[in-house]
Amino acid sequence: MNDRYTNVKIGLEIHVQLSNAGSKLFCGCDSEYRGYKPNTNVCPVCLGLPGALPVPSRRPIVLAIAASMALGCRVPGTVVFTRKHYFYPDLPKNYQITQFEKAGGAPVCMGGVLEYLNTDSWRWERARIRRINLEEDPGKTYYEGSILTSRYALVDYNRSGVPLLEIVTEPDIPSPRHARMLIDYLLLTLEYIGATNPRLEGVFRVDANISIEGGERVEVKNIGSTQDVEKALKFEISRQRLIVERGGKVERETRHWDAERGMTKPLRLKEEEADYLYFPDPDLPPVEITEDMLAEAEKLASKTPGTIYREIESMGVRREIAWSITSTLPAARLFLEAVKLGADPRIAARLVGVDLKGELKEMGKDLYSPNNWPPPQSIAILSNLVARGDYTYDSIKGLVVPKLAANPGSDVKSLLPEKVKDIERLVEEVLNREKRAVQDYLAGKKKALNYLVGQVMRAAKGRALDPRQAREILLRRLSTVKEEDR
């Protein structure tokens, strides 16, 4: 670990919307609020109107349990909701329904350990999870320009009541880079279990708590991307170090990350838990976690990035390629299905995780849309053609993969290049045309052979030709030329 980050403690509060829940947490409004006109995806419950009572939705609770299981946490037998009181324009009831164990609440998770892959060292890191809360998201406030300078605020309540996971880690994270990798892995895990789409705008927000040299912790609120989490933490470490070096004392406070200026700014003094007046929500009785809910959640949590990565790596696939596949869910599903159909794992992994993925990226296609990937049968066919020696990998990579990326639904057999049936004739034509290269080879210049092989490959004009076979025929023919010269 870099010495710059010794004596640093970082803890994260990661808020992730369960965008795939199908409904809001306590009403039937859509959990995917994007695309609605302002204040149209609402009802009396999520607007907090008098007399409207909340009713817990089953699906968000199951997804929250699945997330707890996938992140290595303990799941309680009962979930209890509490009220967190504070005033803000985007909070229509003037309280948020959340979970807080010290006020009689029962979170969906208490305690656990998250293992995440460090893709710099290729080691598994660990961070303890303190708790996972299931709560409702507030509405969204829009400012004219900056939050610090705006003259007014506009509020859209379409988001109000959307189910939100608050994942709180212990201060076990040793550096800004580790924080970014942890969040990336966490979001990928939630995508794997079907809880969320991490690429949606505003689907997650991070509050980072950081302290140095055993001093007071500072909270940086509402960071909206993993890149900005890393930047904000780096800035905050430098800011706090400078205060200490000048003989000052870091104050406990809440700060705002200004992404445009690349710096944190003070918002307010840090509140204590008592300031929020937590107490159990009298409108919501405890929710018992039933056996069928646990079974459904366990099924969702059975496949995580960690299990898939290890499975792919165990097939003899290089770790970099294994992670390239794992980190893109449609690619992982495609690869595993292709292997089930009998694809050679190492060849299929290279096709999916390197060349096809790279081609799609270069074309500007969405890597996370399954429709942009070919069916597993195509990968199985191509990998086995290479494994049998019918085609070289390079010919498939250069002549088939670009066409398959452009038209993933194509019959892959129709994309295969025609095989060269008259290699001997091509070799003879090249030898007759490239007299100087032939003489160079006969004079002992071995590099001339590579040139001649290249000329034979060029003469094939895109048809399938194994360069090793061309080389063997050239060597055999050149040896006869030597004999004739004698």
Curated annotation (Swiss-Prot):
HAMAP family: GatB. It is an enzyme of class 6 (ligase). Belongs to the GatB/GatE family. GatB subfamily. One of its GO terms (biological process) is translation. The lineage of its organism: Archaea, Thermoproteota, Thermoprotei, Desulfurococcales, Desulfurococcaceae. Heterotrimer of A, B and C subunits. Pfam families: GatB_N (PF02934), GatB_Yqey (PF02637). InterPro entries: Asn/Gln-tRNA_amidoTrfase_suB/E, Asn/Gln-tRNA_Trfase_suB/E_cat, Asn/Gln_amidotransferase, Asn/Gln_tRNA_amidoTrase-B-like, GatB, GatB_Yqey_C_2, Gln-tRNA_amidoTrfase_suB_CS, Gln_synth/guanido_kin_cat_dom. This is Aspartyl/glutamyl-tRNA(Asn/Gln) amidotransferase subunit B. It catalyses: L-glutamyl-tRNA(Gln) + L-glutamine + ATP + H2O = L-glutaminyl-tRNA(Gln) + L-glutamate + ADP + phosphate + H(+); L-aspartyl-tRNA(Asn) + L-glutamine + ATP + H2O = L-asparaginyl-tRNA(Asn) + L-glutamate + ADP + phosphate + 2 H(+). Keywords: ATP-binding, Ligase, Nucleotide-binding, Protein biosynthesis. The keyword Protein biosynthesis applies. The keyword Nucleotide-binding applies. Its EC number is 6.3.5.-. PROSITE patterns: GATB. Allows the formation of correctly charged Asn-tRNA(Asn) or Gln-tRNA(Gln) through the transamidation of misacylated Asp-tRNA(Asn) or Glu-tRNA(Gln) in organisms which lack either or both of asparaginyl-tRNA or glutaminyl-tRNA synthetases. The reaction takes place in the presence of glutamine and ATP through an activated phospho-Asp-tRNA(Asn) or phospho-Glu-tRNA(Gln). One of its GO terms (molecular function) is asparaginyl-tRNA synthase (glutamine-hydrolyzing) activity.
